[in-house]
């Protein structure tokens, strides 16, 4: 059995965004432990399993927003020093990082409440501890689109994406832009081309495009209804895949159907966030919760390998 990614769930359900399609709400919060102390015994077992299964990438993510728990992120990075994972990534909506960027470039001193507890000291420390990549979740590169989805108002104070990217690059991070494709945002080949051009202009190392999806079993009818309304049809997804294949050079096929292309020097990955392929026995992601629970799927509660402390 091979495992592609070792995912670590940081924090609680708390989040500083208002995504109407929240995947965590749809997959549910029942898996989250009530206590936030890390089960070191099971973490060691999970890391050993991932290492022996050939995992090269650790992804710190959350059912909420992981950067609201910077000390917990730091703790996991210290724990990972004992394991030979070469690629360590953090998935985030980027709001707190963007606010730090705005403060930095405007030369305005803000207290930690502005960035909700996150500081430049945290980011530099994470980089020193081996965090390679910041994966920024967005619905595109238009500020009003991101503001409407993540903050609930197109006129809300969403940090300029270009400034966030520049700030993270300045620290030394690799940046991946993770675009959730949807109607009203990036939903056509033309919008995909515009997004690729933005990434090239701002030297974004990696671009991942995923269609908005809902899980087979949902815990949030409202979020699922939003996905039904704004999600792309199969014809739209096909057209985007064909367009990228036409202008790009295929580089590699990843587990569960993801395809990586070079498009005039820009790395572009076409993926699907909830794809399941049990046929080959490989695991797309090994998921560790702080209470020690270890699973291999976000949607299905039966995909459990280790139970956590009750």
Residue ranges and their predicted role:
Residues 1-42, 52-54:
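Canonical Radical SAM [4Fe-4S] cluster-binding loop centered on the CxxxCxxC motif
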Residues 15, 96, 140-141, 182, ...:
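Short, solvent-exposed loop/turn segments at secondary-structure junctions
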Residues 31-34, 144-162, 166-278:
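Radical SAM enzyme [4Fe-4S]-AdoMet core and its adjacent flexible, acidic
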Residues 11, 23-24, 136-141, 209-212:
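Short loop/turn segments at strand-loop or loop-helix junctions that form parts
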Residues 63:
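Conserved strand-to-loop "acid loop" that flanks and positions the catalytic carboxylate
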Residues 43-60, 70-184, 189:
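Radical SAM/AdoMet-radical enzyme domain recognition
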Residues 277-310:
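Radical SAM enzyme core and accessory elements
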């Amino acid at each position: 059995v091979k495992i592609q990614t070792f995912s670590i769930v940081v924090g609680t359900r708390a989040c500083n965004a208002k995504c109407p399609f929240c995947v965590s709400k749809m997959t549910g919060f029942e898996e989250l432990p009530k206590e936030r102390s890390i089960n070191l015994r099971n973490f060691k077992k999970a890391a050993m399993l991932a290492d022996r299964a050939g995992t090269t990438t650790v992804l710190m993510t959350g059912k909420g927003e992981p950067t609201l728990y910077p000390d917990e992120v730091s703790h996991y990075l210290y724990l990972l020093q004992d394991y030979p994972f070469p690629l360590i990534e953090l998935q985030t909506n980027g709001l707190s990082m963007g606010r730090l960027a705005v403060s930095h470039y405007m030369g305005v001193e803000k207290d930690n409440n502005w960035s909700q507890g996150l500081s430049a000291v945290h980011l530099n420390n994470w980089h020193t501890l081996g965090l390679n990549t910041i994966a920024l979740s967005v619905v595109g590169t238009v500020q009003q689109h991101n503001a409407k989805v993540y903050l609930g108002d197109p006129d809300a104070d969403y940090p300029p994406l270009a400034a966030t990217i520049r700030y993270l690059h300045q620290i030394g991070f690799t940046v991946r832009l993770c675009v959730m494709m949807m109607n009203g945002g990036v939903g056509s080949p033309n919008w995909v081309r515009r997004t690729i051009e933005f990434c090239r202009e701002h030297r974004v190392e990696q671009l991942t495009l995923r269609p908005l999806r809902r899980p087979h079993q949902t815990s949030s009818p409202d979020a699922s209804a939003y996905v039904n309304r704004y999600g792309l049809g199969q014809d739209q997804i096909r057209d985007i895949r064909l367009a990228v294949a036409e202008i790009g050079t295929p580089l590699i096929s990843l587990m569960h159907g993801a395809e990586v292309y070079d498009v005039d020097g820009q790395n572009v990955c076409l993926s699907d966030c909830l794809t399941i392929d049990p046929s080959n026995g490989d695991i797309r992601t090994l998921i560790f919760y702080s209470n020690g629970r270890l699973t291999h799927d976000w949607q299905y509660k039966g995909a459990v390998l280790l139970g956590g402390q009750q």
